[in-house]
Amino acid sequence: KKGNALIQGTAIAGIFRQYLAGERQIKDEPQELKELFGNDHNKTTDSTLSNIYISDAYITTPKVGKRDGVKLELFSKIALDKSKYDYEILYPGQEFEIKIEVIIREKHQKYEQAFKNYLAQILDGLMNSKITIGAKTSRGFGKIKVKTAPTITALDMTKKQDVETWINFDWNTFKPNTTLQNLGTPIQNDQYITIKTDLLIEKTLMI
């Protein structure tokens, strides 16, 4: 209604989960990953509550453009009749903020370090532009990078002072008390392969 661009936190969570899972299907995810994001995929078991919460990301003064698209026949890849459409894009250089909250409940104490490692991997992926957001990412859209280093606050609910901080918590005034290096070790995904080579355009290339 206000004309702001919005990326829903639930959509960002799904992107992060897929990044952490790599090429695995949901049913093959490690148990600690299912516990972190919640599990409601196997109807024969009880659903589990998510332990990670991600804020909606707002771009308050979006610079929006339009691109043309055309729907293709699935197998022949020939353009279908009367199938032209437009889609909106956000131009490069625009900024948004993501807030991530991870809660380690008593029943998940055994997963504490795994949760921290997953969070460290998410932050590492953001800082090194390994994570893309939005549609048509295979065509080069949605690449993001971190403008400023993430700030991290860890609260211990067995300490009175941390409990009071939690009760009166304000994202705008909280003070970081740990670093990414102290948080955990990113769990490396083995599905990423980088190949660098020189190529020759043998025939005409349309760009």
Name the predicted role of every residue range.
Residues 1-207:
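Small/polar/charged residue-enriched interaction surfaces, especially the RNA/DNA-contacting tracks
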